[in-house]
Amino acid sequence: MSKNIPLISCSPFPASRKIYQQSPLFSDVRVPLREISLTDGSGEKPLNVYDTSGPYTDKEAIIDLTKGLPAIGSSWLSKRADTEPYPARSVKPEDNGLTSSPIPAFEKKRPILRAKSGKAITQMAYARAGIITAEMEYVAIRENEGLAIKDQQTVQSSPLGGEIPEIYTAEFVRNEIANGRAIIPQNINHPECEPMIIGRNFRVKINANIGNSAVTSSMAEEVDKMVWAIRWGADTVMDLSTGRNIHNIREWIIRNSPVPIGTVPLYQALEKVQGIAENLTWDIFRDTLIEQAEQGVDYFTIHAGLRLPFIPMTIDRITGIVSRGGSIMAKWCLHHHKESFLYENFDEICDIASTYDISLSLGDGLRPGSIADANDEAQFAELKTLGELTKTAWEKNVQVMIEGPGHVPMHKIKENMEQQLDLCHEAPFYTLGPLTTDIAPGYDHITSAIGAAMIGWFGTAMLCYVTPKEHLGLPDKNDVKTGVITYKIAAHAADLAKGLPRAQLRDNALSRARFDFRWHDQFNLSLDPETACAFHDETMPKDAHKLVHFCSMCGPKFCSMRISHDIRDAAALKKAKGEGMVAMAEKYQERGDIYVEAPQKKRVNS
């Protein structure tokens, strides 16, 4: 329940409850899943599904935004004993946009941690040292959706060389992280986060972007944007807030977020120089990195691959440079006629990231903003640089993923994945769509989901959602829900195509419910039970309608599934009759005579 905060979306899903699976390796690892109960008498067992919603859908949880979520990761950090508390930097007026903030600071203080001198505390460092962490065990159990781990495994091959095991183990997770093919984005200063993994040999993840409103009424309203996105399935959330209250808003979100939070630090750094890109400096940017690192940001988008020599390559593009971060850095480079300070200081960026185990999401500042510009010289020149920066980060045990396009027609999507795997050494790919056509403003969640499903099948590890408002305006709550669910569909379609373990179980369960006319089970097994039920009830709203063996589209006489039931029953009867004839034939063969002596009747004297 939510404590005196009605704005937060806290209700459980229908016919669902939160369950927790205990790790056999770590006593303090309990992994949340959502259990969907099915109709009594259906013969169906409850179905466990991956759950991103955190405590907000657990009816036993007490949600108090002023206290934040439980710090489930604190005990793991304490046992490893390789981090230390230290005095954090003081909050400055420019951190909140040089305004008096109507959103108060988060009052519950906690120690700010960093790596002890000489200690390598990233998940990649542990993985390379052969150490299985609690976080690795956590994500293995989570990816299995509660399925018991077996000793013997078979491996399912996926497109472009991926290998997916039948059952995930902590050792498999460790090996993927050690080789840079997967990341667990989890800042040591975000202990409230439930560990998750991003990599092409795991289920495809999705990210939702949120940002502060022009007029902010309360901190609960800002936190609820995050809660709403994760309710519908966002695996990570990027806070792209600009303007006023940035620091305080971010603190409230992180303290109450069970999923990794990403940012583009360049946006806040730009606010600190009143939006004048030419006035940006490395010192301002570095200070912003540390500010956000201490708050607990789990991954930074860094546009370090956009270099001065690449800018002229965009001159003949239809849409030029469409990345906000890319355009900021391009303007800075041209004004100073210098190499990007992000590129020049990338080593120190990695040092900061490794101190807090922050993952780097290497931004695609030169991504194509139209299908005409897809796969051009500028895009792939930057991608090659991102591959070089990946190796630099790996040398410092920093976890890395690579951001990708953008706008790409279907026949050019596979090349993007092939180039990324080759140039970026199989680091996880994180793409915005891609949008497969430019003719559908208002429907770009659909144009992009087509590309997202394809590139997810080919190996993209995480998809950044697109809402119906893309290119048009700021998305509202309904747009966020539509975008998240659309991308859950794309990610799930990719998981099915990759042959991911358990991916089809939910499809099969819903198909059986559909064929059996178990309407409530159909609703409850869907990604959006509320909408499924509402659409059904528009024409058949009564409770009795949930028991009938037809819907309003076909009616009782023309329902194909009802007819299929009749056909099945008739076939079963015919089979039974056929079996009776076979039995008679066998009896004849035994006796060898077509004539059978009739039983003698006793004659009754009259």
UniProtKB/Swiss-Prot annotation:
Pfam families: ThiC-associated, ThiC_Rad_SAM. Its cofactor is [4Fe-4S] cluster. Residues 84-103 are annotated as: Disordered. Substrate binds at N209, M238, Y267, H303, S323, R324, G325, D364, G365, L366, R367, E403, Y430. Binds 1 [4Fe-4S] cluster per subunit. The cluster is coordinated with 3 cysteines and an exchangeable S-adenosyl-L-methionine. [4Fe-4S] cluster binds at C551, C554, C559. It comes from the Bacteria. Keywords: 4Fe-4S, Iron, Iron-sulfur, Lyase, Metal-binding, S-adenosyl-L-methionine, Thiamine biosynthesis, Zinc. The keyword S-adenosyl-L-methionine applies. Transmembrane segments: none annotated. Coiled coil: none annotated. It catalyses: 5-amino-1-(5-phospho-beta-D-ribosyl)imidazole + S-adenosyl-L-methionine = 4-amino-2-methyl-5-(phosphooxymethyl)pyrimidine + CO + 5'-deoxyadenosine + formate + L-methionine + 3 H(+). GO terms for biological process: thiamine biosynthetic process; thiamine diphosphate biosynthetic process. Pathway: Cofactor biosynthesis; thiamine diphosphate biosynthesis. Its EC number is 4.1.99.17. The keyword Iron applies. One of its GO terms (cellular component) is cytosol. PANTHER family: PHOSPHOMETHYLPYRIMIDINE SYNTHASE, CHLOROPLASTIC, THIAMINE BIOSYNTHESIS PROTEIN THIC. Belongs to the ThiC family. This is Phosphomethylpyrimidine synthase.
